[in-house]
Swiss-Prot record:
Modification Phosphoserine occurs at: 5-6, 307, 312, 314
Compartments where located: Nucleus; Cytoplasm
Post-translational modification: Phosphorylated on tyrosine upon binding to activated CSF1R; which causes a dissociation of the two proteins. Phosphorylation on Ser-5 and/or Ser-6 is required for nuclear export. Phosphorylated on Thr-328 in insulin-stimulated adipocytes. Phosphorylation at Tyr-225 modulates mRNA binding.
Residue numbers carrying N-acetylserine: 2
Subunit annotation: Component of the THO subcomplex, which is composed of THOC1, THOC2, THOC3, THOC5, THOC6 and THOC7. The THO subcomplex interacts with DDX39B to form the THO-DDX39B complex which multimerizes into a 28-subunit tetrameric assembly. Component of the transcription/export (TREX) complex at least composed of ALYREF/THOC4, DDX39B, SARNP/CIP29, CHTOP and the THO subcomplex; in the complex interacts with THOC1, THOC2, THOC5, THOC6 and THOC7; forms a coiled-coil dimer with THOC7; together with THOC6 and THOC7, plays a key structural role in oligomerization of the THO-DDX39B complex.
Name used for this protein in its record: THO complex subunit 5
InterPro entries: THO_Thoc5 (IPR019163)
UniProt keyword RNA-binding, yes or no: yes
């Protein structure tokens, strides 16, 4: 490469007028080529620094000569041409020097590139050798790791300890004088002893198998004998069915129930056993039954069968699944929610009969993954009831059992561990699913023997029979009381919507014979509307207006006076009395905030409610309170002082007998009715 490039770079000769041209023309080409090639050798001998100084000196001389030529040309004269020619010759010599320096610089550049290329090739060769060596090192390290990780099969055998080996092994195997000092021989001896022991155990195993076969044959013979007895026993049971029905002793049906109960989950099983025992011992009207698919319940406890066909076809199934579209995240969450909220196939039904032939149907479910129980309720009556508009929520499955115990509204899960499970599948609260799954009341968990301590949450809760038995009787009585109370309210609301306040004969003595004020309106009120009423602020601030309560509005009129009564009916009625808030529209608007007598009227029905309870179980409390409000409105209007400036008779003449019309600076009216005297007095 260097020779070819040097041939192309032939130096050009600049001729001057003063130099002899003929001599230069006669030089041979070989001499010129020799001079050209000598420059490559000259590069190694010359100092680049000195060439650089020569280059600067030559450039300065050229500048000087050019300046002198310019100066001579500007002056003019006869001798100027000769001087200019001399300087021109000197300039040509300097140009030749510059061209030579330029050629030397190019030759140095080429040599530098060639040296760099050779050094780069050496570096690449060394780098390749390094990569090969690193690969060899990595390969050797892998082989070393495999050697270190190698485990012999005898290492997986659990050999007896050394003490036991030397104690039990015979001398011809243990060879203590040889094996004590040689670990290798010691291991071989222990393996020989292990082999000897396994041979003995294998012989013993064969003997046991032969004994097992003999016992199995005996069992088969006995099974054949017992199976021959089964048809006879069935015929005897069928023949005894009429006797069982006649004596009201359904042993066959009970036996089937007990067989089905074996497949119940522990909480439902505890409920079934305790409810059946309570019904037999204390309440004959309680009937217990099991519903659902027994086959599905059996399938839950059946272990999965391992088949070789499934393993052989796994590759084909995997290939098919890869071609299917992967379900979206929303579909996966829905499937996880359904799996988490899955109920057990079997459920327990309790039918609780009341005095008026009404029946409370309770269906108990068990949520397997959440480990809680739920219940759905339904009330049926002997005669079809005409449901008033205001009684729509009294017997609804969503509210009929609400707050059977104080604060137990059944909208939250009683198991603290469920909240962590809900977070994984995106469930905010269980209240969104209670209509489908049922309500997880606390008393339902206790009937199933489940108790979830909040202070120290337990990972697994076991059903406890004693817990269920301790709450069974109290809960059944509360359920009966709740149904009877709701049915009584149902009948009363039918009369109230027609403007009739039903007062039983047992409670007539609580009121005067003549009551002029009358009920004209009885409607249900939404919880939000009740919260917005201006005269119910005290109840709302006191925290008595919960969303589990029922709200109603009563309107009582007499003449131009209209009394509004906002009623809060607790689910625990009648053990918890209703709360009334009053607003009288007559000569302005009067509430407990601006009229002490209105506050006193509220106290008569809210505080002194025990006087109005009537005979147990106090189902007439609400109607007696409404009737008392009518009487109180009569007293309020009749005892109001007459304005002398208004002509004509008094709008509400006094018909009630009062010992004293007013008392104290607040002019309180006599609202207490005294029986049997029939007059009103102050408290």
């Amino acid at each position: 490469m260097s020779s070819e490039s040097s041939k192309k770079r032939k130096p050009k000769v600049i001729r001057s007028d003063g130099a002899p041209a003929e001599g230069k023309r006669n030089r041979s080409d070989t001499e010129q080529e020799g001079k050209y090639y000598s420059e490559e050798a000259e590069v190694d001998l010359r100092d680049p620094g000195r060439d650089y100084e020569l280059y600067k000196y030559t450039c300065q001389e050229l500048q000087r000569l050019m300046a002198e030529i310019q100066d001579l040309k500007s002056r003019g004269g006869k001798d100027v041409a000769i001087e200019i020619e001399e300087r021109r010759i000197q300039s040509c010599v300097h140009f030749m020097t510059l061209k030579k320096l330029n050629r030397l610089a190019h030759i140095r550049l080429k040599k530098g590139r060639d040296q760099t290329h050779e050094a780069k090739q050496k570096v690449d060769a060394y780098h390749l050798q390094l990569q090969n060596l690193l690969y060899e090192v990595m390969h050797l390290q892998k082989e070393i790791t495999k050697c270190l990780e190698f485990k012999s099969k005898h290492e997986e055998i659990d050999l007896v300890s050394l003490e036991e080996f030397y104690k039990e092994a015979p001398p011809d195997i243990s060879k203590a004088e040889v094996t004590m000092g040689d670990p290798h021989q010691q291991t071989l001896a222990r393996l020989d002893w292990e082999l000897e022991q396994r041979k003995r155990l294998a012989e013993k195993y064969r003997e046991c198998l032969s004994n097992k076969e003999k016992i199995l044959k005996e069992i088969e013979v006995k099974k054949e004998y017992l199976s021959s007895l089964q048809p006879r026993l069935n015929s005897i049971m069928q023949a005894s069915l009429p006797v069982q029905e006649y004596l009201f002793m359904p042993f066959d049906q009970a036996h089937k129930q007990y067989e089905t109960a074996r497949h119940l989950p522990p909480p439902l099983y505890v409920l079934f056993v305790q409810a059946t025992a309570y019904g037999q011992a204390c309440d004959k009207t309680l009937s217990v039954a099991i519903e659902g698919s027994v086959d599905e319940a059996k399938a839950l406890f059946k272990p999965p069968e391992d088949s070789q066909d499934d393993e052989s076809d796994s590759d084909a199934e995997e290939e098919q699944t890869t071609k299917r579209r992967r379900p979206t995240l929303g579909v996966q969450l829905d499937d996880k929610r359904k799996e988490m909220l899955k109920r057990h196939p079997l459920s327990v039904m309790l039918d609780l009969k009341c005095k008026d032939d009404s029946v409370l149907h309770l269906t108990f479910y068990y949520l397997m993954n959440l480990n809680i129980m739920t219940v759905k309720a339904k009330v049926t009556t002997a005669m079809e009831l005409i449901t008033p508009i205001s009684a729509g929520d009294l017997l609804s499955p969503d509210s009929v059992l609400s707050c059977l115990y104080p604060g137990d509204h059944g909208k939250k899960t009683p198991n603290p561990a469920n909240q962590y499970q809900f977070d994984k599948v995106g469930i905010l609260t269980l209240s969104d699913y209670v209509l489908e799954l049922g309500h997880p009341y606390l008393w339902v968990q206790k009937l199933g023997g489940l108790h979830f301590p909040k202070e120290q949450p337990q990972q697994t809760v076991i059903a406890d029979h004693s817990l269920s038995a301790s709450h069974m009787e109290t809960t059944m009585k509360l359920l009966k009381t709740r149904v009877q109370s709701r049915l009584a309210l149902h009948k009363q609301f039918a009369s109230l919507e027609h403007g009739i306040v039903p007062v039983t004969s047992d409670c007539q003595y609580l009121f005067p014979a003549k009551v002029v004020s009358r009920l004209v309106k009885w409607v249900t009120v939404a919880h939000e509307d009740y919260m917005e009423l201006h005269f119910t602020k005290d109840i709302v601030d006191a925290g008595l207006a919960g969303d589990t309560n029922l709200y109603y509005m009563a309107l009582i009129e007499r003449g131009t006076a209209k009394l509004q009564a906002a009623v809060v009916l607790n689910p625990g009625y009648s053990s918890i009395p209703p709360v009334f808030q009053l607003c009288l529209n007559w000569k302005g608007e009067k509430t407990n905030s601006n009229d002490d007598n209105i506050r006193a009227m509220e106290g008569e029905v809210n505080v002194c409610y025990k006087e109005l309870c009537g005979p147990w179980p106090s189902h007439q409390l609400l109607t007696n309170q409404l009737q008392r409000l009518c009487v109180l409105l009569d007293v309020y209007l009749e005892t109001e002082s007459h304005d002398d400036s208004v002509e004509g008779p008094k709008e509400f003449p006094q018909e009630k007998m009062c010992l004293r019309l007013f008392r104290g600076p607040s002019r309180m009216k006599p609202f207490k009715y005294n029986h049997p005297q029939g007059f009103f007095s102050h408290r």
